[in-house]
Amino acid sequence: MPKWKRRRYMSHIGVICDREDIQATMPQFVVGNARTLLARQIAALRRGRPLNVRLIRQKSAWSNGRLTAILVRHIAAALDGRSGRARDVQVLLLLDAAKIHFTPAVLRACKAANFWLVIIPPRLTFLIQPLDTDAFALYKSVLLDAYQEARSRSANADGDLSMTEFLPCIDGAIQSVLEGRPWAAAFDRDGFGAGQRALDDRVKTRL
């Protein structure tokens, strides 16, 4: 693989919730480093993206505390945009134990949004984090299929996709998987709903 390709990275900070009626409004952050999302292209690439998909260009494609705090504010704005939140509903924000997820800025954002931050313990995301247990594997599979299909249609002789060609693959996978499926049962099975009455046996066995 050419060196220039090895320097190009993207990540997707995904959000799902247990409310099917608002899932499509949840923010999705697609992050690319400066070598992947070129400064001269970023404005054009952002045009035409779904309203809840934010394309972010920064030095690194990895998330950080600043982005996490921004994400919290975007989630709060999406919820408040739905005629206000019901007073009897408490939002739980489930994040893994990476240090970037509980920086002072993130904690302040959660407090301002009245979110309860729930940190999934290390090495347990595979078991009780709904994105990991139910969403990401399917999302990656759908994205790979879309990528291969786009490559087959690409005008480039080597099959490489431009960002203009690749980003719709991500948009489609988000809409098909993250927004196109109900996730309440996943939260229930992982222990975050239904009073834990629907807790999956695999969780009981492993914990």
Predicted regions and their residues:
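RecA-like helicase/translocase P-loop NTPase motor core
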Residues: 1-207
